[in-house]
């Protein structure tokens, strides 16, 4: 680009002839770019001045000067906590090893002297025969049988502990040694636990207590098995009670005496069992449901029916009082009837001809038969 010569006062000295080789629009473009170049030059000079000023200030400031900013009085922080460093104390000298004290020797307690066990006695002495009773003591009759059965029942009830263990079992629990004994005269003894088959001769109805009999259906041999002590056909007499509890299915029968065909009589005092040896005799039980609850149910139904009919036949204003009075009366009658009949005991029926059993509860001595042909 060619500059035009100018005069000293800034004006053009003379007209510059345009160059015929440069087009007119190129001269116009250069004329428009000229202000931009001046602007860029001014910006570069300003930046250079700013940079030089910053370098001069950084060199003029002290090299290690610290700037401290003072906070306002309301925002000043409290002074920090001061710690004091104490010198380390010297470690104490180690203690010398001391021997351990020996354990004291305590005197040993002396063992207690052994206590000899108490002498054990057999519940039944088989070596000595039972003492004979005179004929007056062996009189038969309802009084003797009732007394024997009552004594047997009291003995069984009193001999049971609270936990259901019999008195004999409770006595034997504390015994540590059992000694065997030899029973003499086994040919004329029946041992406890002997089973006697019997056929019931009388019907049993437990509404009232009473007596019953049975006939021995099979010969019963002695403990040795050599002699028949209770022959077939022997009559056994016993007694039953009437206090059958609700829900019970068995009746207790106590057999008191044996009457042999030869005329010999012996006190038995043993309970009745069924064919399997279970205590008591089973039978047909009538729980009397109709007698216990029939009256109360009937009165309750009548009360409901009366209330229903009164509610239909009475007007709405007075029917409520009459209905409540009638219903309350019927309910009271039903409760009174139930209280009077709820405790009716059930009845057990045991037919005659049933096969039952007798379990001997104590040893029976038949030494009176010694020397006879029986």
Swiss-Prot record:
GO terms for cellular component: plasma membrane. CDD domains: VirB10. Residues 92-116 have a biased composition (Pro residues). It is a single-pass membrane protein. Keywords: Cell membrane, Membrane, Transmembrane, Transmembrane helix. The keyword Transmembrane applies. Residues 87-116 are annotated as: Disordered. It is found in: Cell membrane. The keyword Transmembrane helix applies. The chain crosses the membrane at residues 38-56. InterPro entries: T4SS_VirB10/PtlG (IPR047695), T4SS_VirB10/TraB/TrbI (IPR005498), T4SS_VirB10/TrbI (IPR042217). Belongs to the TrbI/VirB10 family. This is Type IV secretion system protein PtlG homolog. The gene is ptlG.
């Amino acid at each position: 680009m060619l500059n035009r010569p100018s005069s000293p006062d800034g004006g053009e000295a003379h007209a510059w002839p345009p160059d015929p080789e440069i087009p007119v629009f190129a001269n116009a473009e250069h004329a428009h770019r000229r202000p931009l170049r001046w602007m860029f030059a001014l910006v570069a000079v300003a930046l250079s001045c700013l940079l030089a000023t910053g370098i001069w200030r950084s060199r003029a400031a002290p090299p290690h000067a610290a700037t401290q900013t003072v906070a306002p009085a309301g925002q000043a922080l409290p002074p920090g906590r001061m710690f004091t460093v104490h010198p380390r104390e010297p470690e104490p000298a180690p203690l010398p090893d001391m021997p351990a004290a020996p354990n004291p020797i305590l005197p040993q307690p002396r063992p207690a002297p052994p206590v000899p066990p108490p002498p054990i006695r057999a519940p039944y002495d088989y070596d000595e025969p039972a003492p004979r009773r005179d004929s007056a003591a062996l009189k038969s009759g309802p009084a003797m049988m009732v007394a024997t059965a009552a004594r047997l029942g009291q003995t069984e009830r009193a001999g049971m502990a609270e936990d259901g263990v019999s008195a004999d079992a409770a006595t034997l629990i504390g015994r540590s040694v059992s000694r065997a004994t030899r029973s003499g005269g086994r040919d004329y003894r029946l041992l406890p636990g002997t089973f006697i088959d019997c056929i019931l001769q009388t019907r049993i109805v437990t509404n009232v207590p009473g007596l019953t009999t049975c006939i021995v259906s099979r010969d019963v041999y002695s403990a040795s098995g050599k002699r028949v002590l209770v022959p077939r056909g022997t009559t056994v007499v016993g007694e039953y009670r009437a206090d059958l509890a609700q829900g019970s299915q068995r009746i207790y029968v106590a057999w008191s005496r044996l009457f042999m065909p030869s005329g010999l009589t012996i006190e038995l005092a043993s309970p009745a069992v069924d064919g399997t040896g279970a205590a008591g005799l089973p039978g047909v039980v009538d729980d009397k449901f109709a007698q216990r609850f029939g009256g109360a149910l009937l009165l309750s139904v009548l009360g409901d029916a009366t209330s229903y009919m009164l509610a239909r036949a009475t007007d709405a204003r007075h029917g409520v009082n009459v209905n409540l009075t009638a219903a309350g009366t019927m309910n009271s009658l039903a409760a009174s009837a139930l209280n009077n009949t709820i405790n009716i005991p059930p009845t057990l029926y045991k037919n005659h001809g049933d096969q039952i059993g007798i379990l001997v509860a104590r040893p029976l001595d038949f030494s009176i038969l010694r020397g006879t042909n029986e």
